[in-house]
Amino acid sequence: MNKLLRLIVDNKADKPRPFNLARNGDAASLYIYDVISADWGVSALSVIEAINQAGDVQTLNVHLNSPGGDVFEGRAIMAALAAFRGKTVAHIDSLCASAATSIALACNEIRMAEGAFFMIHNASGFAWGDKTELRNTADVLEKIEGAIVNDYTSRTGKPEQEIRDKMQAETWFTAQEALDYGFVDSI
């Protein structure tokens, strides 16, 4: 089992965690400090409920410290943030890896703390079944990867193959490297 997956499994909660939304005038903050999953950790539904609780705030601060998780939950959170009527600001407080990167990229602005990390890698998953089912799973992973590559190239302006090479290598960016590469706006 790869190290990131082991970290996710070892730190999973028994069920999705509820959010405490912190409001301060025209701004609200939510903290995605866990694995992204419909079954445990942070679910898309819990984030959507928190966004709805924010009401008509002008700025939504999204604090991230997540090893990632379920790509589809991450993309649902991404869509919810993109639909938010105000400004969204991602704050990468420690770790923004895998599916959590989609959440950061959905925000209008991305700030990263000194000492934090941003990790990208190829889509991965589990498969069970005969050879046809395994091949079908690989085909789906390639489609998922294509969507993620598109997100990363749109954000950074880097060529597709360069992004694919970084994902293949499972690249960990420091805050300065993520800034230089175009993933974040400021440190």
Spans of features found by a protein language model:
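N-terminal organellar transit peptides
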Residues: 1-101, 107-187
